C-alpha cells in the first residue's frame, strides 16, 4: 500500500482540482495504513478491513436490496406490471445520479477542508450533515441532520419489523411482537462493529443472501404457476398507485449512508460510478422476482405485503427466510451505524479507541428503534410512508439542491474538485437534471406520494391499531365449544 502511495505522489499533476482530489485519496490511504499497521497479510485484515472499490460496491448493492425484495411484489399489485418495471428503472437511475452528486460534494468538502485548514480525518468519520455544513452553512447542516437521522432511524425500525415478519413464516408459535423483542436484542449487537470499514465480509455475505432470495422468489413463483382465478387489475386506485410508487422510490433511495461508505474507502474518488454499478446488479434481482411473484399471485398481493406469505412452505423457502433474517441484521447495522456516529459526536465519545466503551455508549440509540418497531409493525405500508416523507428529501431533493448551490458561482465551478461527467458536457446540463429531480420528487414523491402513503398508513392504524400484536397474521382457530369438551 505504501509503495502504491509513493508511485501516486511521484506523478506531476496539473490543476488545483486534481491536486485536491489526490490529497483526498492519499490521506484516506494513510488512514488505512495506520489502521492496518503495515503491509503484512492477515486473515483479520482480509475479513475485517475493507476499503477497496469492490468493498464499496458490495456495501451499496447489499444495502440497497434488503427487505424491499419482499415488498416489491406488493408494490407491483398496486402499480401494475408495466408501471412497476418502468418506475424501478427510472428511480434506479435517478438514485444513482443523486448518489453521484453526494460523492462529488464529499470530495469537494474534504478537498477544501484539507487545503484550507490542513485538517486530518484520521480518527473522524465524515458524515453527510458535516459536508452540508462545510459547503453551505449551519442551516443546511440542521436540515441534513434532521432528515438523515430520522430516515435512518425508521430504516432501522423497518429492518426489525421485517425480521419479525419473516421468522413468523418459519415459527408461528410466537407472535410477531414477541419476535420483535427477540430480534431487537440480537440487532443491538451491531454496536460492536466500529465503522463501514469493518463490514467487508458482512457485505459480501449479505449480497449473496439477497441474490439467493431473489432467485428463489422468481423460480418458486414460476414453478407454482398462476394461482387459480388470478387477476391483475392494478392500478385501480390513485392512492394505491402512488403508495406503490413511493415504495420503489424508497427502494432506490438507500444512499443515506453514501458518505460513510465513501469515507471508509482507500480512494474515495473511485466511488463516482459505484452506486450505478450496484444499481444495475440490483435490477437483475428486483425486476425478475417482483414480476414473477406478481404474475403468479396478482391481486392477492394487495393483502399480503410480504411475498413469503403466499409461497408454499418448503426447505427452499425456509432457507430464504433464514438468509433474509441474517441479511436484515446486517442492514440494521448499515442503517444504525451513522446514528451511532452522530450520538458519539454529540456526547464527545467519537474519538474513543476502546471498542467496548464505544459499544456501551451506543446502546441508547437502539432503544427508540426497538420501541417504534413495536408501535408501528406495518410491514410494507411503513416503507412507502418513509419513502414519501423522508427519502424524498434526504437522498433526492437535498443533494440536488446542495449541488446546485455549491457550484452556483463561476469561481466555484472553475475550481471544482470534480467537473461534470463526460456524458454531460456543460454545467447547464447538470443544473437541468438537478432541477428536474427537485420538481419531480417534490410534486410526485413528496406531494402525491405523501398523501397516498399516509392515507394507507392511517388505514392500517385504524384496522390493526398501534402496538398490533401480530400484523396480517392468520386468525387463531375457533375455540372448541364447551359442550363438545365435556363429551370427550
From Swiss-Prot:
Xref: InterPro entries: AA_transpt_TM
Keyword list, A-Z: Amino-acid transport, Auxin signaling pathway, Cell membrane, Glycoprotein, Membrane, Symport, Transmembrane, Transmembrane helix, Transport
Stretches of the chain found on the membrane's Extracellular side: 83-84, 163-178, 224-238, 295-320, 384, 449-488
Membrane topology: Multi-pass membrane protein
Compartments in which it is found: Cell membrane
All ranges on the Cytoplasmic side of the membrane: 1-64, 106-141, 200-202, 260-273, 342-362, 406-427
BP-aspect Gene Ontology terms: amino acid transport; auxin-activated signaling pathway; root cap development
Main subcellular localisation: membrane
Gene Ontology CC terms, in alphabetical order: plasma membrane
Coiled coil regions in record: none
UniProt keyword Transmembrane present: yes
Molecular function via GO: auxin influx transmembrane transporter activity; symporter activity
Sites where a glycan is attached: 303
Record carries keyword Ribosomal protein: no
Residue ranges of the region described as Disordered: 1-36
Regions that span the bilayer: 65-82, 85-105, 142-162, 179-199, 203-223, 239-259, 274-294, 321-341, 363-383, 385-405, 428-448
Pfam entry (one): Aa_trans
Role: Carrier protein involved in proton-driven auxin influx. Mediates the formation of auxin gradient from developing leaves (site of auxin biosynthesis) to tips by contributing to the loading of auxin in vascular tissues and facilitating acropetal (base to tip) auxin transport within inner tissues of the root apex, and basipetal (tip to base) auxin transport within outer tissues of the root apex.
Recorded family membership: Belongs to the amino acid/polyamine transporter 2 family. Amino acid/auxin permease (AAAP) (TC 2.A.18.1) subfamily.
Designated name of the protein: Auxin transporter-like protein 1
Protein's organism: Arabidopsis thaliana
Amino acid at each position: 500500500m505504501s509503495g502504491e502511495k509513493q508511485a501516486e505522489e511521484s506523478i506531476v499533476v496539473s490543476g488545483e482540482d486534481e491536486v485536491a482530489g489526490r490529497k483526498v485519496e492519499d490521506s484516506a490511504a494513510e488512514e488505512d495504513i495506520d489502521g492496518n499497521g503495515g503491509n503484512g497479510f492477515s486473515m483479520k485484515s482480509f475479513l475485517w478491513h475493507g476499503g477497496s472499490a469492490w468493498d464499496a460496491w458490495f456495501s451499496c448493492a447489499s444495502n440497497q436490496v434488503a427487505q424491499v425484495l419482499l415488498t416489491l411484489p406488493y408494490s407491483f399489485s398496486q402499480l401494475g406490471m408495466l408501471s412497476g418495471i418502468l418506475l424501478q428503472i427510472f428511480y434506479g437511475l435517478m438514485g444513482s445520479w443523486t448518489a453521484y452528486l453526494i460523492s462529488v460534494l464529499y470530495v469537494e468538502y474534504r478537498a477544501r477542508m484539507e487545503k484550507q485548514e490542513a485538517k486530518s480525518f484520521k480518527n473522524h468519520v465524515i458524515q453527510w450533515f458535516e459536508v452540508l455544513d462545510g459547503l453551505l452553512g449551519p442551516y443546511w447542516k440542521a436540515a441534513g441532520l434532521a432528515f438523515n437521522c430520522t430516515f435512518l432511524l425508521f430504516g432501522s425500525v423497518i429492518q426489525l419489523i421485517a425480521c419479525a415478519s419473516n421468522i413468523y413464516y418459519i415459527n408461528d408459535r410466537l407472535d410477531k411482537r414477541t419476535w420483535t423483542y427477540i430480534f431487537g436484542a440480537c440487532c443491538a449487537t451491531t454496536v460492536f462493529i466500529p465503522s463501514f470499514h469493518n463490514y467487508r465480509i458482512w457485505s459480501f455475505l449479505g449480497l449473496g443472501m439477497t441474490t439467493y432470495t431473489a432467485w428463489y422468489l422468481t423460480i418458486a413463483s414460476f414453478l407454482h404457476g398462476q394461482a387459480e382465478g388470478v387477476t391483475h387489475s392494478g392500478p385501480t386506485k390513485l392512492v394505491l398507485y402512488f403508495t406503490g410508487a413511493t415504495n420503489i422510490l424508497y427502494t432506490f433511495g438507500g444512499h443515506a449512508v453514501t458518505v460513510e461508505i465513501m469515507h471508509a474507502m482507500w480512494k474515495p474518488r473511485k466511488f463516482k460510478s459505484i452506486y450505478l454499478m450496484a444499481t444495475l446488479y440490483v435490477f437483475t434481482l428486483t425486476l425478475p422476482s417482483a414480476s414473477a411473484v406478481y404474475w403468479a399471485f396478482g391481486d392477492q398481493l394487495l393483502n399480503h405485503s410480504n411475498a413469503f406469505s403466499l409461497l408454499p412452505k418448503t426447505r427452499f423457502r425456509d432457507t430464504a427466510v433464514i438468509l433474509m433474517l441474517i441479511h436484515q441484521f446486517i442492514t440494521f447495522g448499515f442503517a444504525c451505524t451513522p446514528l451511532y456516529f452522530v450520538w458519539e459526536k454529540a456526547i464527545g465519545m467519537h474519538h474513543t479507541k476502546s471498542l467496548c466503551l464505544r459499544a456501551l455508549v451506543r446502546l441508547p440509540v437502539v432503544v427508540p428503534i426497538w420501541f417504534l418497531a413495536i408501535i408501528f409493525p406495518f410491514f410494507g405500508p411503513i416503507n412507502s410512508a418513509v419513502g414519501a416523507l423522508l427519502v424524498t428529501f434526504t437522498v433526492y431533493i437535498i443533494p440536488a439542491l446542495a449541488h446546485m448551490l455549491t457550484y452556483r458561482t463561476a469561481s466555484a465551478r472553475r475550481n471544482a474538485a470534480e467537473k461534470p461527467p463526460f456524458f454531460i458536457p456543460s454545467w447547464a446540463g447538470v443544473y437541468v437534471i438537478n432541477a428536474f429531480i427537485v420538481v419531480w420528487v417534490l410534486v410526485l414523491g413528496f406531494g402525491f406520494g405523501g398523501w397516498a402513503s399516509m392515507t394507507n398508513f392511517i388505514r392500517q392504524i385504524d384496522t390493526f391499531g398501534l402496538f398490533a400484536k401480530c400484523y396480517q397474521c392468520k386468525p387463531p382457530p375457533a375455540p372448541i365449544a364447551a359442550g363438545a369438551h365435556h363429551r370427550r
